[in-house]
Amino acid sequence: MTHNTILGILVSSMISLPALAEVKIGYIDMQKAIQETAAGKKAKKDLEDEFNKKKKDLEKKEADIKKMHEDFEKRSMAMNEDARMKKQNEIRTEMGKYQETAAKAQMEIQKKERDLTQPIVTKLRSILEDIAKKEDFTVVLEKSENSVMWAKKEIDLTDRLIKAYDSKK
């Protein structure tokens, strides 16, 4: 190798080292941030209340169907074929309605969860962007099973994000 080539490699490596030293990385746990903000806790409670109400309604319908089925079992021997078929169809119809109601309730709960958490996520992202710009972070990663395998606790911005969110009510 010529002297100029070696000098070029040496100079270029020196130039790139300071650039690497200026990279500032942080991460957040978005799920934790959502769950631990005051708004997130309220959303969780509202969601649990809605879920428990729907669950109670479904449990009552399930108990009614179970009672219908038990009554049918007790009386089926005394029924003629037409009455037995009619009662079985009635039980099947009620079971189908129950399953539709359960599926609808699940979809409503999922929609409500999205509706409650989306504004929180939007505000968290905005606050995070402010923190990252103000403190000159190069990149902020979201902690999840597949993205951040390990990182120093010092670069975890989650608690700061939660505090900033709750202070901006």
Language model region names:
Residues 5-14:
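Sec-dependent N-terminal signal peptides
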Residues 1-2:
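N-terminal hydrophobic targeting signals that begin at the initiator methionine
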Residues 17, 166-169:
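Generic C-terminal helix-cap and adjacent flexible tail
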Residues 15-21:
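Sec/Tat signal peptide C-region and signal peptidase I cleavage site
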Residues 22-148, 167-168:
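Amphipathic alpha-helical segments
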Residues 149-153:
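Short, exposed beta-strand-loop hairpins at the edges of beta-sheets
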